[in-house]
From Swiss-Prot:
Main location: secreted
UniProt source species: Phyllomedusa bicolor
GO BP term, example: defense response to bacterium
This protein's name: Dermaseptin-B3
Tissues and organs where the protein is expressed, per its UniProt entry: Expressed by the skin glands.
Pfam families, A to Z: DD_K, FSAP_sig_propep
Signal peptide start and end residues: 1-22
Gene Ontology CC entries for this record: extracellular region
InterPro entries the record matches: Dermaseptin_dom, Frog_antimicrobial_propeptide, FSAP
UniProtKB keywords: Amphibian defense peptide, Antibiotic, Antimicrobial, Cleavage on pair of basic residues, Secreted, Signal
Family according to the record: Belongs to the frog skin active peptide (FSAP) family. Dermaseptin subfamily.
Subcellular compartments: Secreted
């Protein structure tokens, strides 16, 4: 009977250890996925920022050109 108890406790202990290891790996994978998502969103933000900056420059140049033609026409 004592041998059976020890075996059951050993099986339960090993099961808990393996379960905790699996949970830890799962948390690590979730953290890695979150970091990848953060990196992708930062890249998208930088892309939009650069695109808007370029549009702003073009709009400024167009406005400056229009003002120069109006001043030159007078």
């Amino acid at each position: 009977m004592a041998f059976l108890k020890k075996s059951v406790f050993l099986v339960l202990f090993l099961g808990l250890v393996s379960l905790s290891i699996c949970e830890e790996e799962k948390r690590e994978e979730e953290n890695e996925e979150k970091q990848e998502d953060d990196e992708q969103s930062e890249e998208k933000r930088a892309l939009w920022k650069n695109m808007l900056k370029g549009i702003g420059k073009l709009a400024g140049q167009a406005a400056l050109g229009a003002v120069k033609t109006l001043v030159g026409a007078e």
